[in-house]
């Protein structure tokens, strides 16, 4: 009986160790994906603000060249 009990504990232990390792890897991958998403959102916001700024600058230049008439 004691032998079966020890064997059962060993099997459960050997099953739980890989399970916990998989959980750690999964959480690391999710964190990496979240960081990549955050970085892409920052880049998108930067590009949008640059385009808006360039549009305002060009609009001001064309407005002053044409004498403010469209």
Swiss-Prot record:
It is found in: Secreted; Target cell membrane. Residues 23-44 form a propeptide. It comes from the Eukaryota. Residues 25-44 are annotated as: Disordered. InterPro entries: Frog_antimicrobial_propeptide (IPR004275), FSAP (IPR016322). The keyword Transcription does not apply. GO terms for cellular component: extracellular region; membrane; other organism cell membrane. It holds the Pfam family FSAP_sig_propep. The keyword Signal applies. Keywords: Amphibian defense peptide, Antibiotic, Antimicrobial, Cleavage on pair of basic residues, Cytolysis, Hemolysis, Immunity, Innate immunity, Membrane, Secreted, Signal, Target cell membrane, Target membrane. Residues 29-40 have a biased composition (Acidic residues). Highly expressed by the skin glands, and intestine and weakly expressed in brain. Residues 1-22 form the signal peptide. One of its GO terms (biological process) is defense response to bacterium. Monomer. Belongs to the frog skin active peptide (FSAP) family. Plasticin subfamily. The native peptide is a cationic amphipathic alpha-helical antimicrobial peptide with potent activity against both Gram-positive and Gram-negative bacteria. It has weak activity against fungi and shows low hemolytic activity. Acts in a synergistic effect in combination with Phylloseptin-B1 or Dermaseptin-B2 at doses that are not active alone. In membrane-mimetic environment, it adopts well-defined helices that lie parallel to the micelle surface. A short amidated analog (AA 45-67), shows potent activity against Gram-positive, Gram-negative bacteria, and fungi. Plasticins have huge conformational plasticity. They can display random coil, alpha-helical, beta-sheet or beta-harpin structures. This is Plasticin-B1. It comes from Phyllomedusa bicolor.
């Amino acid at each position: 009986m004691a032998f079966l009990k020890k064997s059962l504990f060993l099997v459960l232990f050997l099953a739980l160790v890989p399970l916990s390792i998989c959980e750690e890897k999964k959480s690391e991958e999710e964190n990496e994906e979240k960081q990549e998403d955050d970085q892409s959102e920052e880049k998108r916001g930067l590009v949008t603000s640059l385009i808006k700024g360039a549009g305002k600058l060009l609009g001001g230049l064309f407005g002053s060249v044409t004498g403010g008439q469209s």
